[in-house]
Amino acid sequence: HCLSVFIANGFFMNADEQEFSGLVKRHKGTIYSVCLMFADNQDEANDLMQEVLVRLWKGFGTFQGKGDEKGWVWRVAMNTCITQDAKKKHFTKVPVEENLLTSDTEDSKQMRMLHDRIHRLEPFDRAIVLLWLEDLSYEEIGQIVGISAKNVSVRLVRIKEQLKKFNG
């Protein structure tokens, strides 16, 4: 028990591991939000989260403070989830019985419906919506996904129209 407390508090980590641990602590909520948007259930979101963390660790040595940390984390998370989503589409999808939101309140039903509609978007559009829901500016979204702020604005208008057309 004591050993796990020492490890959890970073006593046996080298400087890179401590720095990476701090990065994960600062951005774990954001990373998990991205994973949830691409997952069919919480177990899948946790698996995606692990994959994102592995990719962040592999790229951490080359990143380490060079550029915008938040943008880098977003890009790695988005790219990982989009790649995994594309791989998943090669397999037959089994209907999901476990829902991310299990409460039956009206708000949770609306949230579930919104999540389902967003989940039906193409991965790139889903990424744009997720970033927009996180209150990032069009400029920040554009930098992360690699398009202009004007293009972000146009795409969001089209995405909102598409979401309205989806049947619940």
Q: Language model features by range: what are they?
A:
Residues 91-119:
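Acidic, proline/glycine-rich intrinsically disordered inter-domain spacer in sigma factors
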Residues 145-168:
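DNA-recognition helix of helix-turn-helix
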Residues 120-140, 144:
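Short amphipathic alpha helix immediately N-terminal
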Residues 64, 75-96, 107:
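Arg/Lys-rich amphipathic alpha helix in sigma70-family domain 2
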Residues 52, 76, 128-129, 141-142, ...:
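Hydrophobic positions on the alpha-helical face of helix-turn-helix-like DNA-binding modules
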Residues 14, 40, 51-68, 87-88:
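Sigma70-family region 2
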Residues 11-33, 37, 46:
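A short, charge-rich alpha-helical start-of-domain segment used by transcription regulators
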Residues 33, 47-54, 67-79:
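Structural recognition of an alpha-helix C-terminal capping motif at a helix-to-coil junction
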